[in-house]
Amino acid sequence: MELQGRYAEIRKQGLGLIAISYDAPETLKKFADSRGITFPLIADPGSATIKRYGLFNDTVDPKSRTYGIPHPGTFILDRKGIVVSRFFEDAYQERYTASTILSTIGRGTPAGSMTASTAHLSMAASISDTTAAPGERLSLIADVTPARGMHVYAPGKHTYQVVRLELDPQPWLKVHPAAYPRFEIYHFKPLDERVEVFIKAFRLRRDVTLLATPPAAQQLSAMTTATITGALEYQACDDKVCFNPTRVPVSFTVKLRPLDRR
């Protein structure tokens, strides 16, 4: 179980971990014993707590075997029990990995990384997990530091090329929208323009999911690794000149593990 494999890392980050299920206590104990789970599993027969959190799945036919299965996801609570973050997917087959959650909330250490530099900036790119299974959601992160006097463009009301982490399409990969940090407004005096830019070091994050649909899962089952490729694309300017758009390749290889169907 992926969470058990990351339990030590979660504890190291000062966080605890519990899981709640509608299963009976004896069912959860059997499940935990068979998989060596050491963090607490809480039984919620009748789904009373699950319903209070609005996680009871009543969107399917009551006669379906999936009726009542909770919407799978993760809540991050503070010490007062207040929810400060939540991570949920539309499809029950898809899940955030623990490392993706940790990286999203600013905790944890990337599992794999690479560096690159150009005349305009330096970049350290990393991936949350180097081992994953179909259905798991991973984070690709680009920590970008513009060179002195340089800026690159944030999304906004302009026609310059926005800095972006573009990923090559694969039939077994779902690419999620990029997450951008806050930008600055820069006054480009030669044209008297005010545009959205990044001048200081910043982080881009783009999540991807290894698809668990039957066609994708079948394709992934014949592979031992999955390579995710793409590039950091940007246009940089200084206070006088805008340079040609530039593309910095990135590549990460993820070792594949099979789905646990027990």
Name each region found by the language model.
Residues 1-49:
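Structural microenvironment flanking redox-active thiols in thiol-disulfide oxidoreductases
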Residues 54-64:
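Short, basic/aromatic recognition patches
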